[in-house]
C-alpha cells in the first residue's frame, strides 16, 4: 500500500501542467472510509501546493472494476492523468 501511495504522489507531480497550476485527474478505487482518508492526505497536499485534483473513484472489485474503467478510457483516447494500478496489471495494457 505504501508503494501505491508513493506512485500516486510521483504521478501527481510529474503528470501536471506547469502553466496554470498543476491539474490532475486520478482514477482510483480507494473509496472505503480508511482508504478515502488516506487519499485525502494526498489531495490536501496537492491542493496546498497549488494543484487541482479531480477524483475518478471506481468502487468494487478490489481494483478490478477500476482496471476495466481505465482500459475503457485508454481505448477511448481519454486516459486519466494518473491511475492507481496493481503492478502486474499494467502488463495487460501492453498486450492490447
Per-region residue spans from a language model:
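Sec-dependent N-terminal signal peptides
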Residues: 4-14
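Short, surface-exposed alpha-helical segments at coil->helix boundaries
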Residues: 36-40
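Short N-terminal segments immediately surrounding and downstream of signal-peptide cleavage
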Residues: 22-34
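Residue-level marker for beta-strand->alpha-helix junctions and adjacent short loops that shape enzyme
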Residues: 11, 31, 89-90
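Generic anion/oxyanion-binding catalytic loop in active/binding sites
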Residues: 9, 28, 71
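Sec/Tat signal peptide C-region and signal peptidase I cleavage site
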Residues: 16-20
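Extracytoplasmic "Venus flytrap"/periplasmic binding protein-like
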Residues: 22-24, 41-96
Amino acid at each position: 500500500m505504501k508503494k501505491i501511495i508513493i506512485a500516486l504522489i510521483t504521478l501527481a507531480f510529474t503528470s501536471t501542467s506547469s502553466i496554470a497550476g498543476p491539474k490532475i485527474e486520478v482514477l482510483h478505487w480507494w473509496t472505503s472510509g480508511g482508504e478515502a482518508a488516506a487519499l485525502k492526505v494526498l489531495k490536501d497536499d496537492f491542493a496546498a501546493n497549488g494543484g487541482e485534483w479531480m477524483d475518478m473513484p471506481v468502487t468494487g472489485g478490489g481494483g478490478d472494476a477500476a482496471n476495466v474503467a481505465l482500459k475503457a478510457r485508454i481505448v477511448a483516447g481519454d486516459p486519466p492523468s494518473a491511475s492507481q494500478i496493481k503492478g502486474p496489471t499494467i502488463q495487460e495494457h501492453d498486450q492490447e
